[in-house]
Amino acid sequence: MSTKVPIYLKRGSRKGKKEKLRDLLSSDMISPPLGDFRHTIHIGSGGGNDTFGDISFLQGKFHLLPGTAVDETQEDSGFEMPFQFTRTATLCGRELPDGPSPLLKNAISLPVIGGPQALTLPAAQAPPKPPRLHLETPQASPQEAGTVDVWRIPEAGAAHSELTTESGAEEPFLSHASSLLSLHVDLGPSILDDVLQIMDQDLGHLQIPT
């Protein structure tokens, strides 16, 4: 066979047997996609009407593209080339045409954050505040802040005495538990008396009569 034929199409060592193309090709011959390959620039057969991407290498010479050649008579008559939505056309300062651009006909613009669209959004309602337990208690003014504890203590004592007289002697513990302003803590038998007695005994032994 000719040397110009690719190596994967050449016959093997077996003679007289025609090999099929699917037997010669394998998936290992297909190179994986390159990570740095990007289709960022495209110039189609239509020339200026079929381009996108960064074509700044043209340096504004759009007449070099196929299909965009304009004769001198059209240039003198004031004929303008159609606007191309490319980076170069935008940087060159070419003005937008009055008519809608075919490239932007089906485009959908996203709302700008903080723009006029943001004013029409419904305001988020704040969550309801939890109920407070001290709403029923009177609020003291800053001038009476020092006397708050003075007039609250008799009120708590009066409520405690009223509950005690109503419940009677049969339920003394309920009167303490029903009052929110009173605190009843039972620490059990106190050992303070025992400690004081031991201290008195030690002092008695230390004092020797003269």
UniProtKB/Swiss-Prot annotation:
It is found in: Endomembrane system; Cytoplasm, Cytoskeleton. One of its GO terms (cellular component) is microtubule cytoskeleton. It is a peripheral membrane protein. PROSITE patterns: CRIB. Residues 30-44 form the CRIB domain. The modification Phosphoserine is found at residues 31, 101, 141. GO terms for molecular function: GTPase activator activity; opioid peptide activity; small GTPase binding. The modification N-acetylserine is found at residue 2. Pfam families: BORG_CEP, PBD. Its main location: membrane. Residues 124-145 are annotated as: Disordered. The keyword Phosphoprotein applies. SMART domains: PBD (SM00285). Keywords: Acetylation, Cell shape, Cytoplasm, Cytoskeleton, Membrane, Phosphoprotein. It comes from the Eukaryota. InterPro entries: Cdc42_effect-like, Cdc42_Effector_BORG/CEP, Cdc42_effector_prot_2, CRIB_dom. GO terms for biological process: actin cytoskeleton organization; cellular response to type II interferon; positive regulation of actin filament polymerization; positive regulation of pseudopodium assembly; regulation of cell shape; Rho protein signal transduction. The CRIB domain mediates interaction with CDC42. Belongs to the BORG/CEP family. Probably involved in the organization of the actin cytoskeleton. May act downstream of CDC42 to induce actin filament assembly leading to cell shape changes. Induces pseudopodia formation in fibroblasts in a CDC42-dependent manner. Interacts with CDC42 and RHOQ, in a GTP-dependent manner, and with SEPT7. PANTHER family: CDC42 EFFECTOR PROTEIN 2, CDC42 EFFECTOR PROTEIN BORG. This is Cdc42 effector protein 2. It comes from Bos taurus. The gene is CDC42EP2.
